[in-house]
Amino acid sequence: MLTQVLAGALLAAPLEFREHTIATDLKGGYQVVPCDVNHDGKIDLIALASGMTELVWFENPTWERHVIARDLHGMINLAAWDMDGDGIPEIVLAHEFSMRAKESIGIVSVLKHNGDPRQLWNIQEIDRLPTSHRLRWADIDGSGKKVVVNAPLTGAHAEAPDYRDRVPLVFYRPGDWKRQIIDDSSEGLVHCITITDWDHDGRDEILSAGFTGIQLYKLSAGRRWMRTEITKGDPAPWPKSGSSDVAVGQLGKERYLAAIEPWHGNEVAVYRMSAVAWQREVIDASLVDGHTIVTADLANDGTDQIIAGFRGQPQRVYIYSFDGKRWNRQTLDDGGMSAAACAVADLNGDGKLDIACIGSATHNLKWYENLGPAKRTQP
């Protein structure tokens, strides 16, 4: 089902943002991660650029640049979390990545500060798994002790364009960092993983998006991993099938999924649960090399908007808002951001979620200040 998205400005007052440029020299910008790096209560931004050999972070509020580590090649993804409770996050990094599995070393390393996060950090290699591509921290057993989930892009013997091979999904526990298998039955290509407490039981589940669609992985009470297919994604023939990126959002009390489809695709698809199954609605089919999708309550009204960005021309970032009947689109950035990744956080402490995006072809990092109303309080 294809629904033509309508310009939000024609139907409702658009959300208002003020654009701020932080950096313009991040060659191959690929990921931006908001977190408090220096334990001062302000949300900083870690910027990963695949065309650079330095991993850097920008300190809020002046956005002074600091180098975390040097001489890193083929950086592709990171996840940050304070695993030792000192107030400063540890970083798990995937590097030495290549799209060609046979040439992808797939190094996974842990980076830890030396007492001053503004100085160079220590690096410890923990694994080598070809095409290691997406890393996320997750509390899989509800203990509060998170593990690192690693989703390689493809299997070790996969070749373009079909990438026919089994793709492992693994995790590591801090300490011994031993690789443990979650699943190795998925085929093709897996582009994204998203961590969510799917059934509200205090334990995180894993959503993956790839050629076989959107899958859910859950650790059972018997400590066995269970895999459930949520949706097959785009119904086109392989390798144009499935999903590329997925996010979980809320329309009041109703949960929905937002996805870019197919891999690096042109569609923004929304999935809402009917009586028996998830129903797919394509709300936009105009993206060119879609690469990031995020959901967040930008209006502070209990309903999540969708933020989607694409790397190809004309290089735009869109926001989609639901008015009760249809999704309305507004442009956040028109031509100035080839968005490889966007993230949301309250960057200026005013109670509103702001947006940060990093551009691949545009080599830049921006944050978009939310000028809307603060969170409503109960009378």
Q: What name fits each language-model region?
A:
Residues A12-P379:
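Beta-propeller-forming repeat regions
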Residues M1-A9:
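Bacterial N-terminal signal peptides
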